[in-house]
Design a protein with these regions (language model features):
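A generic structural signal for solvent-exposed, polar alpha-helical segments
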Residues: 37, 65, 100-104, 115, ...
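A surface-exposed partner-binding patch
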Residues: 1-101, 165-198
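Compact, glycine/acidic-enriched structural inserts
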Residues: 105-148
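An amphipathic alpha-helical core segment
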Residues: 137-171
Length: 198
């Protein structure tokens, strides 16, 4: 029923890569108007045609757009958008995947957040749902995030979206092969150099 819409989401947000199983469930739930996952995870998935946050310059004035420093930042952000595949609004700003070609292909995609200041944050876990649940665990009424995560995992399982683990300490926390924050800095410096700003 949603095959065409899922294919479009894959093309627009993931460069045609297969949509992970949990993301598929969450997308269909949003499109069906279900709010149970939204309530638990605080995610709102992008609709077709929404601009990637790293490519959005609509908030900048003409003067800012003409500024060589800002042009360097925008060019670096556009390059980063090739690797930062954001799929939803939530968390500190936006949430998605880090798909740099130098990352090992034999593991699940790294999860990341981008905040409104263009800072990159890693999420633990092997799936988007695990990463977001771990992040949300620290904002629950339960002060112990390990217990809160287990409770969230149980609620998600009841809704038909079981996590790979209910143990917070067992969540995957593998380091990036390529650090997004460092790469962004390097790209900005390279763009500054192209513009004679060094």
């Amino acid at each position: 029923m949603y095959d065409e819409r899922l294919a479009g989401f894959s093309r627009e947000r993931l460069d045609g890569r297969p949509i992970p199983g949990d993301l598929r469930v969450l997308l269909v739930a949003q499109w069906e108007g279900r709010t149970d996952f939204t309530h638990l995870l605080g995610l709102e998935f992008f609709e077709a045609g929404e601009v990637h946050p790293l490519l959005d310059t609509s908030y900048l004035s003409e003067e800012e757009l003409a500024d060589p420093e800002m042009q360097a930042v925008n060019a670096a952000a556009a390059e980063m958008a090739k690797y930062v595949k954001l799929v939803a609004k939530g968390g500190k700003g936006w949430i998605g995947y880090w798909l740099h070609p130098d990352e090992p292909g034999d593991r699940a995609w790294h999860l990341m957040e981008l905040d409104t200041e263009f800072s990159f944050w890693s999420l633990v876990g092997l799936t988007l749902t695990e990463g977001v649940a771990a992040e949300r665990a620290s904002y629950q009424d339960e002060p112990d995030e390990r217990i809160a995560f287990t409770q969230l995992a149980a609620e998600l399982a009841e809704l038909g979206l079981p996590l790979g683990t209910q143990d917070y300490d067992a969540l995957d926390d593998t380091e990036h092969a390529v650090n997004p924050e460092k790469l962004m800095e390097e790209l900005i410096e390279a763009e500054r150099e192209k513009r004679g700003l060094r």
